[in-house]
């Protein structure tokens, strides 16, 4: 059975590749900002919104490829009730990291599998990350080292690189922090016979 990842995310694609999963990457055209604003206005939770976005992505691609299992995933960063999007530039990334310094935030991460336009399964994880009280000197070195690569992450960090040094404690699933609850997804795919067991 063919697997498709409804995402252009290099982190998600890399996770699947490293797990030995052959999935074609086909990004879904979804107006994420509009969906987030609409759901937030309706009082939806971050988990409901992340799942709706993941579902939209998987559903759109699964209608075009009805015989494939399509994986959609989305992640929202929540800090003290506020939702955050990716920083548009390094100046705002710096401000965000200073704002998160010494505080905890959550990465609400949802994955959905769809086939033929219908949702087959979904799963949500909400890891909690505690950012340490780092110095401005450390932050300046970190920003210089990582550069614009930080703008691809909603939290302005990559745990698989020097970004791990921003934290003193992490609670929850590592793969969910990277962008997709991989172990529950693998379990579903085996159960659905989309993977060899």
UniProtKB/Swiss-Prot annotation:
A cellular component annotation (GO) from this entry: cytoplasm
GO molecular function: nucleoside triphosphate diphosphatase activity
Cofactors (names): a divalent metal cation
Top-level taxon in the UniProt lineage: Bacteria
Principal location listed in the UniProt entry: cytoplasm
Gene3D superfamilies per UniProt: 3.90.950.10
Location of the protein in the cell: Cytoplasm
Entry EC no(s): 3.6.1.9
Top EC class of this enzyme: hydrolase
Family the UniProt entry places it in: Belongs to the Maf family.
Main function: Nucleoside triphosphate pyrophosphatase. May have a dual role in cell division arrest and in preventing the incorporation of modified nucleotides into cellular nucleic acids.
Protein name: Nucleoside triphosphate pyrophosphatase
Native source species: Granulibacter bethesdensis (strain ATCC BAA-1260 / CGDNIH1)
